[in-house]
Amino acid sequence: MISRIKSFKNALNYDKMNCIEIILRRNDLMSTSFENKATNRGVITFTISQDKIKPALDKAFNKIKKDLNAPGFRKGHMPRPVFNQKFGEEVLYEDALNIVLPEAYEAAVTELGLDVVAQPKIDVVSMEKGKEWTLSAEVVTKPEVKLGDYKNLVVEVDASKEVSDEDVDAKIERERQNLAELIIKDGEAAQGDTVVIDFVGSVDGVEFDGGKGDNFSLELGSGQFIPGFEDQLVGAKAGDEVEVNVTFPESYQAEDLAGKAAKFMTTIHEVKTKEVPELDDELAKDIDEDVDTLEDLKVKYRKELEAAQETAYDDAVEGAAIELAVANAEIVDLPEEMIHEEVNRSVNEFMGNMQRQGISPEMYFQLTGTTQEDLHNQYSAEADKRVKTNLVIEAIAKAEGFEATDSEIEQEINDLATEYNMPADQVRSLLSADMLKHDIAMKKAVEVITSTASVK
């Protein structure tokens, strides 16, 4: 598996390329070339010398040696010459290539000064016994960014620093609702109530996978289930059996269910409703032990909201200024692979969070009535914006010649250690110096944009 390569230090400027092919020679006899196929696209051809191949073959052999049998030898003790004669050294090539390829590919990328932004497509050109191996890699490189105005920008923001009495009351009400308790309700279920149910789903009388649940707590109106399901439980009481009829969306993840009518036999075990505490001094104390009265809580919340509003306003100005700087720039032929990789990163992060909560991808798509494609589309626009923003900010950092000093790197490490409550040494082990330098340069570029911006 080839990991994504990022080389910010030696970005290749295609405008300055006067030739189609560059060939370099390294001290280790590795030959490297790059052929420009199109804007931001090309093919690297590189060789791997026998000095690198032989140790990789040894590692590949040692990896499988313990499982080898041969007459006259104990299991795991087959000599290498016997193995080569019996099976041929070529059977080790694939494992050996996996061992040596990442380092060889990265060396080729670094040698050529390329800034590769997507997974390469690797092909074997030649792989002969006793000779150097030749491989090719189709790569996508970072696009050129032509900067426009990014200093002294004038922006408009739809944000206010003001905090109203209604804002304070709303915050207290949210906390009040958080302290609400679910109590058994004798009457009919209403929107906002929680019902504890068993359900069995079927299509044309046949039950389907994932359509059954026991003692499931469902808040009516939460939108957890497919459209129409929750509405049909409004008015039900404990002990009722309700036949819920719904139609799966045409875009439903499970293709065999998409667009089909389904019936869910649903048993109501309990109906629960929220009981919220009174809005008084006792509630204020329950919300915050540092206050004595409801009025004290309002004063404290007003100060907190004003600080948060100030931050939100500053963030809005920063966001608007960055957005305008990006709009003023021109990105030459943005590779779609960059967007795809950013979308995949976002989707994988989201699904990882879901799985940590015990929700599998299949369960998520079934509960929400969405598909993998829907999720990718959901993140696509944001991914496009994020990629373009990063490219422009990187270009500004480069244009301004921003670099990170040793003291700035150390401060960044300490700040991250404090933020994530981990030892500074652990932060150092997780983040390379290049990553830290890049992040610091990016922050400086953002500061140039925002510190010179003004609000209309």
Swiss-Prot record:
UniProt-listed SUPFAM superfamilies: FKBP-like, Triger factor/SurA peptide-binding domain-like, Trigger factor ribosome-binding domain
**Compartments, as annotated in UniProt:** Cytoplasm
Entry's InterPro entries? PPIase_dom_sf, PPIase_FKBP_dom, Trig_fac, Trigger_fac_C, Trigger_fac_C_sf, Trigger_fac_ribosome-bd_bac, Trigger_fac_ribosome-bd_sf, Trigger_fact/SurA_dom_sf
Major place of residence: cytoplasm
Domain PPIase FKBP-type: from-to ranges = 192-277
Give a GO biological-process term: 'de novo' cotranslational protein folding
GO CC terms of this entry = cytoplasm
The entry sums up its family as follows: Belongs to the FKBP-type PPIase family. Tig subfamily.
**Domain notes per entry:** Consists of 3 domains; the N-terminus binds the ribosome, the middle domain has PPIase activity, while the C-terminus has intrinsic chaperone activity on its own.
This chain's protein is named Trigger factor
